[in-house]
Amino acid sequence: MKIINRTMRNKDRKIEVTHYVPASPKASIQIFHGMAEHKDRYRELLTYLALNDIHCVIYNQRGHGPDEKKEKLGHFDSFEDLLSDAKVVFRSMPADIPRFGLGHSMGSIVLRRLLADDLYDGAIIVGTGSKPNFKDLLSEKFLKVLSLIIPRKKLTSLNKLSFLGYDGNFKGREKNRWLNQDVSEIVKYNSDPYSGQNMSVKALSEILKNIRYVDRIRHIRRYKDIPYYLIGGADDPFSHFGRDLEVLRFRLGLHYSKVDLMLEPNARHEVLFEENKVGIYARIVKWVLDYEEK
């Protein structure tokens, strides 16, 4: 296995892309990290996949990671910019093997937008969620107006109200305990200078708008009939404790022939970082390579 770093450009933006390259790759996966984290957190997953003959491509999304200027951490102007970056990075994937997308949390929303563009041979949607209620519609409208007034402002109270007020579902004193039942992972996340940052009003507005957008039936109907693998924690409050994944499986199943769901018991939002993560990695490998062998 080799790790190769390269710089790509999307107009005036430099994108630092990392490839995990096996000696004889059988498939390739483009990974999209979640909100308020960065690509380096995924080293263990990427190493495992590469050691099992899966080529991996990852980069930091706008407003995230040490590549970003400090004043821009937690901010991006448009979800369309995230999609544009993703398509640039996609071009670096080898074209002679099956190409998959894997997105976690906010990254799953990016992936679900991209699925309408017929890029991938399969999709692994991890830790996704929905905001289907009337109060979510009101929140979307409120954030849209606020983003016109103070787009770059990062309000702690607004971040908690929008996405991060889930700790109350779990006993304990650790901040962000809703992410993971493994306390050591929570400690690492909370001590990471590039994880857990507040997002700007504009970024929150764009994220919420697109969470609601990707649930529209007319958007889902634009997908192609490729394999879909939905993965989440049964104790994840963002997915309403797995309900959103079950609803998405039903909706996809109305139109597409292969839709699989893995709801991991006792796992919270960051299912790829839970105590049983290696078992989850192994199931991802099997699912991808089963496709490659057909």
Please provide the spans of the model-predicted regions.
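N-terminal cap/lid segment of alpha/beta-hydrolase-fold proteins
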Residues: M1-V21
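Alpha/beta-hydrolase active-site loop
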Residues: H75-M93
